[in-house]
Each structure stands twice: as C-alpha cells, then as structure tokens.
Amino acid sequence: MIPICPVVSFTYVPSRLGEDAKMATGNYFGFTHSGAAAAAAAAQYSQQPASGVAYSHPTTVASYTVHQAPVAAHTVTAAYAPAAATVAVARPAPVAVAAAATAAAYGGYPTAHTATDYGYTQRQQEAPPPPPPATTQNYQDSYSYVRSTAPAVAYDSKQYYQQPTATAAAVAAAAQPQPSVAETYYQTAPKAGYSQGATQYTQAQQTRQVTAIKPATPSPATTTFSIYPVSSTVQPVAAAATVVPSYTQSATYSTTAVTYSGTSYSGYEAAVYSAASSYYQQQQQQQKQAAAAAAAAAATAAWTGTTFTKKAPFQNKQLKPKQPPKPPQIHYCDVCKISCAGPQTYKEHLEGQKHKKKEAALKASQNASSSNNSTRGTQNQLRCELCDVSCTGADAYAAHIRGAKHQKVVKLHTKLGKPIPSTEPNVVSQATSSTAVSASKPTASPSSIAANNCTVNTSSIATSSMKGLTTTGNSSLNSTSNTKVSAVPTNMAAKKTSTPKINFVGGNKLQSTGNKTEDIKGTECVKSTPVTSAVQIPEVKQDTVSEPVTPASLAVLQSDVQPVGHDYVEEVRNDEGKVIRFHCKLCECSFNDPNAKEMHLKGRRHRLQYKKKVNPDLQVEVKPSIRARKIQEEKMRKQMQREEYWRRREEEERWRMEMRRYEEDMYWRRMEEEQHHWDDRRRMPDGGYPHGPPGPLGLLGVRPGMPPQPQGPAPLRRPDSSDDRYVMTKHATIYPTEEELQAVQKIVSITERALKLVSDSLSEHEKNKNKEGDDKKEGSKDRALKGVLRVGVLAKGLLLRGDRNVNLVLLCSEKPSKTLLSRIAENLPKQLAVISPEKYDIKCAVSEAAIILNSCVEPKMQVTITLTSPIIREENMREGDVTSGMVKDPPDVLDRQKCLDALAALRHAKWFQARANGLQSCVIIIRILRDLCQRVPTWSDFPSWAMELLVEKAISSASSPQSPGDALRRVFECISSGIILKGSPGLLDPCEKDPFDTLATMTDQQREDITSSAQFALRLLAFRQIHKVLGMDPLPQMSQRFNIHNNRKRRRDSDGVDGFEAEGKKDKKDYDNF
C-alpha cells in the first residue's frame, strides 16, 4: 500500500515533446494529435510550465503519485495533467487537449501554493464552474498492486453536474492516461486544492466509492487526474489560491447540507457572487438534468473505452451543452451605466473616484427625495428611465435619445438581456409613488452589482442588503431586484433569491458594495422616519448638497462677487405650499438648497447668462481655463528653457573655442613635425629636392626606404606654426576677467545715463532762463550737452587684464568752459544717486578738461570724461586769422589741445571699428603688443595709435588670412625692416586730412631701440623661443609623441641612409630639445 501524501509527491518530469510522442505511440489520445494541435493547445494555456505530463521511468520500482491543482477545465470533464514537483512544491502543467467545437475551454489556474497543498489563483474564463462538490474525485495511476488506503469520497445524492455531449467527454477521457499493468483502482480522495492550510475537506455523510477500473494497456506514466464538475454558465469565477468559499447546500435540493470551510480571501472579492449565481443556476438545472443522466453515462463509458464506470452522481454530467456560443462575460455597473472588460477592471472601477462620486450623488439624490418626499427635477423635466438622467426639455431629451451614451446603454442592456424601458418621455411628477419608485430603483443596484460584480461579501452584508430592500415596502423593488439579478447572463435561468441559505466567507472588506448597502439602509431609515419639524429639512438638504461642492465653487462663494438676478429665480412649491426647490429661468436649472441658490447667483455661469440676456454691461471676471493656464505655464517653461539654452550655448561656445584652439594646436604641431621632416630632407647633400618646400605632385628622386613625398601642394604653414599656441595662451592670460568686464560695463552705463540726466537738467535750466530773456528762440536751438561717446581701448575692445581706466568724450554744443565743467561736476553726483545707490568719487580736472569718476567698490574703476566740441576743430581748419577766432572764445575756455585730442580719439575709434575689428588676428596681436609695451620699457615709447596702424597694415597686406603666430611674426618683420626708423616712409594718420606722421613724437633713439628689439624678438621666434618674447613659461610640448614619431622615422630611414644622414638626424633632435 502506497499512502497518498497530502503535501507533495515526487515525479519525474520529462519534456513535453516526449509526452506527446509517448501519448501518440500508445494511442493515448482517442484522435490524431498533430504537432499543430499540440501547439495550439499549448498556446491556449498561458500558465503552462515547460514541463508537460509528469512521467515515471518505466524501470522505476517505487510508486510515484502526483497531486495537482486543476489548470484547465472543459465543459465535458476536466482533464488535468499532473504537475511536476521535484523538490517540495508541485507546479501544475495542463495537458493540451483540443476541446470539442461545442465545448468552451476554461482558462487555467495559476499556481499559488501553501506549504501543504495546492491553491488556485484567479483565472479568467468564459464560463464558470459551479461551486465545488462535496468532494472532488481524484484518480490516480499507480504501480502498486494493492488498493490505496486513501479515504473514500462521499457524494451528495442530489447534486448533479452536467456534462456536454459524449464527443466532448471522449476528448477529455482520451486525455487521461491508461492505467498500469497491474490492476489500478481509481479512487476518490479528498482534495486539498481549495484549502489554504493542510486541512482537507472531510464529509461525514454517506460515502460512495468509485468502482475499480479494469486494467488496460500498460503505461509507464503515473498521473493523477481530478475531474471537476463544470457548469455551462458564462459567469466567470475568480478563484484565488488562498480562499475557500463555504457553501451550504439547500435542503430543498440535497439530502444533507455540507459546509466547506476554509480561510478567507485576502485579495479578491469577486468570487462569491459568481459562485452564488452559478450555485443558483446549478440548483435550477439539477432537476431538469436528471432524466438524461443514464444515457450520458453510457456514452461516456463508451468513449472512454470502459476505462471506468461512473455511478449515478456523475451521470447527470452528460447533458447536452448550449448550442449557441456563449457570450463573453460583461461586468456592468448600474450606477455608472458602463461595462468593464474583466473583473480586475471592474474592481478598479468600483474603487475609482468617478464611481464613488456618482455613488455619492445617488445617495444624495435618495436622501433628498426621502426628505422632501418629492423628486428633484424641474417641472418640465423629462426623465430617461434607462440612463437614469433628467432632461430640461423635449429637445434635450431627443438629443439624449440620439446620443452615443444612450445608445451605448441600450446596446449593453440588449446584450445583457435586461429589460429596456420605452423611449417615450416620462414627465417627472411630484407624487409620492414616483418618489418611492425612484428611491427603490437605485436601491436595487447593489443587488445587481452583487450578481454582476464577482465581488466577495459576507453573509451579514447580503442579509442586511435584503433587509434594506424589504423595508421600503414597495412591490416594485423586489421585482426590479430579481430582474437585474437574473438578467446578468443571457442564458442563465431564473433563480430564487434564497440568499440566507448561502454562507459567504470572503474578503475582509468590500468597499463599494458595503458602502452602498449601508447607504441604502440609512436612506430607508431616513425615509421611514417621520419629519417632526421643518428645521430638520434644511439640515438634510445642506448635508446632501454640500458634498459635491467643488473648491472652485467655494472660491467663488468666498469672493466679493455680488449676487445678481434674484428676480429670475422662482420658488417651486408643492401641494402643501412648502418650498421644495428653486428654479432659475436664465440658466434653466434647479436647486433645493438656499445656500446653493446664493452660490448659483454668485456663480460665473449665472452671471454670464445674466450678462448675455439681461445686462450686457455686467462685468464678469475672466476665468482662465485649464488650457489657457497650461499655455501660460508652457510659455514660462519655454522661456526658462530658452534662457537656460542661451546660457548653456555661451558655455558651450567657450568650450568650443578652447577645443578649437586645442585642435588647431594639434593640427599645426603635426604640420610642424612634417615640415621638420621635409626640412631635413632638403638639407641632405644628395637629396634630389631643391631648397624650399617640396615640389609639385609626382616629383621624382625619392630614395628607396624613404617615406613617400606628401601628395598635393606644399603646406602653407611655416615651421613656426607652433607659435599660435603660445600666442593664444598668452592672449588668454591677458584678456580681462569676467568680473572686470562686468565692472567696466556697469560703471560706463551708469555714467552715460547720469550724463543724460545732467544734460536734461541743464537744458531745463536754460529754457527757464531763456523764457525770462528776449532771446528765447536763439537759446533753445541746441542743448548744452549733445552726447557722450566711448573712445580709446574701451571703444576698440583692447582692454587688458588689470586695466582700470576708460575714457568717455562728452560733446558740447559750444566750446567747453570751466563754468560748464564745474556745473556738470556739481550736478553729476545728484543724478548718479538717482540711478545707482553706490557711492562714486567725482573730481574735476580742469587742466585735463575732464571729470574723473572713481568707483568706491572693488574692482575700483576710473572713468575719465573729457569735454570737447566739434566747433574747435572747425575753427582750426578754417583758413584766416586764428587770433580773430580766438577772440570770440569765452575767457574760461578749456585747453584747446585736450579738446582736439578728444576729437581725434573719436575719429580713431570710428576708424578702428571699421577697419581693424573685422580683420583676423588683428585685435589679438594688438593686445599682445600692448602687453609687450607695458612689460618692456623699450616698447613703452611706441605710440598706441601708430602701433594699431602698423598691425592693421601688416596683417591686411598679407595675401591670405594670418594665424596669430604668423601675424605676430609678420608685425615683427615689418618693424625689423626699419619701417619706423628715421628716413623711412613712416606711418601716416588716415584720420587726418593733412599728412601727419603718427611716429613724429618718437626720437631717433627710441625708433632704433624698438627696431633692434623687434629684430631680436624675430630671432627668438626663429629659434622656437617665442615664450621669451611673450614673457611666459614654455608650454609643455608633446615630446613623447614627437620622439615616437622621430623614432619611427629613424627606424625606417636607418636601413637606406649613411652615417652622415643619421648623424644629421641626431643633431636635429638635439636642436629640437634646445
């Protein structure tokens, strides 16, 4: 005797391919089982593991027994494959069996095991099985030659399970394995599949054993099959692994009431009502199916090859199935009038905000109707009973009937088989009977939801629900409830609502249905309670209406908007003369709360209607819509993104400039190395190359073993191209910092604005003064101060790091005088205080014809404001007696030469911006030379304007754009040639009409010293010591790469050159290091 272990059994799991082959060889299936059918069947069960039917080795002596949870259930019979459990837990694996055309296959059970048995998780299927019978039969194939000692199974004598045609039964029977060589007894054993713990279902009622089955063809596989009765309903059962609903059989249909007990659901609440519906249907069908039991049992025995004989309780499974295809299960919500795709979606819908809001609105409607003893619609409202909505007029009702929502509800009700009310408009009346009907109709929805929802509930909830339904005392309530319950599936028979006979052991909480039932009870209690005083009515109404108030309505209520249109709100009274609601003629709406009335009169909708129909001058606030708010937020976000984009772009531009410089340095370094190589080739005594760069394409004379001549024209760069790196590095060190640039920009802009205010003040003063005199017209022609301009390094963009002095030129309409200078110096501090809170030190320098402005914060900047006038230069250029012109000057006129120099600075700045700013490398070289003039005393005597002219002429006269290194070398070459020496052509000033040498202020010694220094700098550049000219440390050379390059070339050249050539290369290396 091999005891049946309730916990787990060990099986050998072969591959699925071997299973199909063995089944096909041993005529296991009653029909041809092709590979395509197997694939289709395997695809039918998504939870199927890799292993197929559990097999035992033929040579194994020990007996293997498999207990598994059913995975797929057919309407014929449930053919299950045993799961393969090799260590501790058995995992289900369905046998892929093609079902008959008329038999709908159910989905598989995913495994969810406990420590001792198998559980069932939720499965989605087209038709639910009835609740499990008193026991389930467990068929076992074993190698033991004796009967197993498992306890027998007791079957209820009155419990019948339908089965479809014999063809479907044969398919299921064909899926069963043949017994072993020895006589194998198929016996029933209690299944622990519906239990969470180790407790099995026991039954103390009458016991019947299934007769032993004749021995058949030997099969080495040991399998266990559990046949679960399947009902032909379409109601799905969401069975979970940890739940066991407890069923109590009614005494009407069974001899003994058997109760299944187990642990409750922890997650799914959907199984109880479906099980209840199936159980009701099964009880109705049991009486009708007893007649065809014997014939169906005979057919089953014939198809299974007399494998085993079933007794009476199994004969009623052979009834014919429903011929039309079973429609898919539709989860319908009566409150929201929508359907859901599945139980999980329906459950999420019940927990959603939209459903809860409609549920609260339904509750409010019921409470209000119970309190007022009247409906809430307007006088002319037309009600659609199907959609449970009210329309304000015939046009609105006709539009609703034609609308998509109504048509969708009609289609759903047609599909569900529910009665569809007439589309004739139902005018809402104020009678008490209609109130009872309207109150009872939503009340029945929890019952229908309970039948449709597949939601687990407790027996107390069901009982309370029925109590709440009976308290109304309305006959139409029960009929509505019964109709909705029975009309869930189209092919489900009518059921008696004998709810107290079923004990529901389900989930811990049921939010939607429980709340609805409690709300119904509360509604009915309020309805049945007489109204003692009129004071209680507004309280109930206030509670009812205040729930759906939105924050926007509260904000409008709390605002300072005054209510308008009191005369257009009518009071609707009932037969007793009591105010039951208010009706607004403008908005065509009704409300039953005084607070809602005030809120409506202040609301934006009412005010818009009042403005449109009564008073167009009424100001209605523009409420930004969600779209407008989103557009504004999008604009702000895009603006921030744009600012961030430009900031990042500036940073990236700086980074690109640095990378470009680095790449250019790398490029010119490679070119320099190549150029050095060709220079060495030219220095060879027998090299065939002429002096200078390599010849054109295809030049002969390349010696064997030498690298080929570079193709194309000769590179334009000279050997000194590495100077660009030094020049750019030096330029980066002398360029002003960001803080210095910001400080310069700040003080210059503040000074310019302050001078503008000073000019306005002086102009006002002059106007007031001229109004008192006789020459008003003459004095009002020009302002005293015409404008301020930037000059010098500030206008040319030649600032260096550390420069603290910038120059401005203030143009005057008349010749500047000391009086005007003092007036400006006195008025400037007042205007500066208006513009900027910072303190500035202002000093009047009469000898310089300027005002000096110093900032008091770091970095301290100085602005020199020089006064001048174009009249001074015009008089100077005028032919005639100069003294006669000077007689007209005021006695305190400022220094004439200073004013002329300021005018010349204006011309120089204009010329520089037009000619030098756009020239490549010009500004960079001028900054380098300005730094050289500050560092080296010899160059300090070089006039800045002459240097700018020289650099511009040297770079612009080149045949091609010059790099910074080449431009610097070209400038030194020009100076070294003696262009600034006495007797040379010199540098004429292009901003003067008469010829004027810009080098006239330099002495001969200074000219010679600068020329000599330029020649020495040129020699340093030729010997790769430009860092000494620039006053910086040598930059780290890529000596490693350069040496590697030389070593590579030396290895190639050493094969075909003589010792002199190799010696020359060694000298070149030493020269480079030097």
UniProtKB/Swiss-Prot annotation:
- Position(s), cross-link Glycyl lysine isopeptide (Lys-Gly) (interchain with G-Cter in SUMO2): 509, 541, 623
Q: What is its main location?
A: nucleus
* Compositional bias of kind Low complexity: 362-374, 427-447
The subcellular location is: Nucleus; Cytoplasm; Cytoplasmic granule; Chromosome
Keywords assigned by UniProt, alphabetized: Acetylation, Chromosome, Cytoplasm, Developmental protein, DNA-binding, Isopeptide bond, Nucleus, Phosphoprotein, Repeat, RNA-binding, Ubl conjugation
Q: Which superkingdom heads the taxonomic lineage of this protein's source?
A: Eukaryota
**Domain annotation DZF: ranges:** 703-1073
Q: What does this protein do?
A: Involved in postimplantation and gastrulation stages of development. Involved in the nucleocytoplasmic shuttling of STAU2. Binds to DNA and RNA.
* N6-acetyllysine modified-residue sites: 509, 516
Q: Which Pfam families match?
A: DZF_C, DZF_N, zf-met
**Which positions does the record annotate as the modified residue Phosphoserine?**
1054
For molecular function, the Gene Ontology terms on record are: DNA binding; double-stranded RNA binding; single-stranded RNA binding; zinc ion binding
| Lineage of the organism | Eukaryota, Metazoa, Chordata, Craniata, Vertebrata
Query: What's the protein here called?
Result: Zinc finger RNA-binding protein
**Quaternary structure per UniProt?**
Found in a cytoplasmic RNP complex with STAU2. Interacts with STAU2. Does not interact with STAU1.
Q: Where is the composition biased (Basic and acidic residues)?
A: 762-781, 1062-1074
Q: Which organism is it from?
A: Pongo abelii
Show the GO cellular component annotation of the record.
Answer: chromosome; cytoplasm; precatalytic spliceosome
PROSITE patterns of this UniProt entry?
DZF, ZINC_FINGER_C2H2_1
Q: Which stretches does the entry tag as region Disordered?
A: 120-139, 349-377, 421-447, 702-723, 761-781, 1040-1074
Please name the InterPro entries in this protein's record: DZF_dom, DZF_dom_C, DZF_dom_N, Matrin/U1-like-C_Znf_C2H2, NT_sf, Znf_C2H2_sf, Znf_C2H2_type
